[in-house]
Amino acid sequence: MARKGSPASTEAAFTRSATLRPDSKSAQTRERILDAAAHVLSLKGYAGMRLADVAEYADLQAPAIYYYFPSREDLIEEVMWAGIADMRAQLASVLKEVPADVTPLDRILIAVETHLRHELEISDYTTASIRNAGQLPDNLRTRQLEEEAKYGEIWRKLIKDAIAAGQIRPELDRYMAQMLVLGALNWAVEWWSPKRGSLEKVVSNAQSFVRNGLSPAG
């Protein structure tokens, strides 16, 4: 499917029905529908996502979608949850592999790169989740908000560790710093395209911005 595939993490490989084996034809069809919905939602948004477009992209008849999802809203809710859940799992996995001697501030910069690459290059699900977060009614955001809180906790620890190491300016409010950084990273889905520069350049500029904005030497 498209430029970005399904969520890679086991945790975010969706709440498949217990009757569907992951390798079964039904499970594969369900995943195709989710992939297609993520792609369409990332491009057209909550208001513009039609099941007919999802079906066309998934190479299915639209009524087939209802076998797997009771409604359009159920499908959207699953995509929105999966996008954040997978990004959280990806960041946790990346940070787990970072050598112990890497400084707390550099761990933040690694998180910056992981976030940007995931939302801009790896996952339509994450792009859709970030781009549509403010458009969904509250009843569709319960699981997404829970995942956002867990993702934010990873960043809180990163910033807390950097403060303890003296690598963040003491006058900065840690919560505001975190929200400003994440807000800037999330906004990249709205303005970036390869025509505006390579993803590598976006990452390096963002890392420089964050380092110089947070560091006492900045």
Predicted regions: what they are:
Residues 1-28, 98, 218:
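N-terminal intrinsically disordered/low-complexity leader segments
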Residues 3-8, 170-190, 201-213:
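Hydrophobic alpha-helical segments that form the core
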Residues 26, 34, 76, 80, ...:
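Amphipathic, non-transmembrane alpha-helical scaffold segments
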Residues 29-37, 54-55, 79-91, 155:
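Generic hydrophobic, amphipathic alpha-helix propensity
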Residues 32, 40-74, 78:
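Helix-turn-helix
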Residues 78, 92-124, 174, 178-181, ...:
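Hydrophobic alpha-helical connector segments
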Residues 82-93, 118-121, 128-131, 138-165, ...:
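Amphipathic alpha-helical packing segments from all-alpha helical-bundle domains
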Residues 103-109, 142-147, 164-180, 197-205:
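All-alpha amphipathic helical-bundle segments outside canonical DNA-binding/catalytic cores
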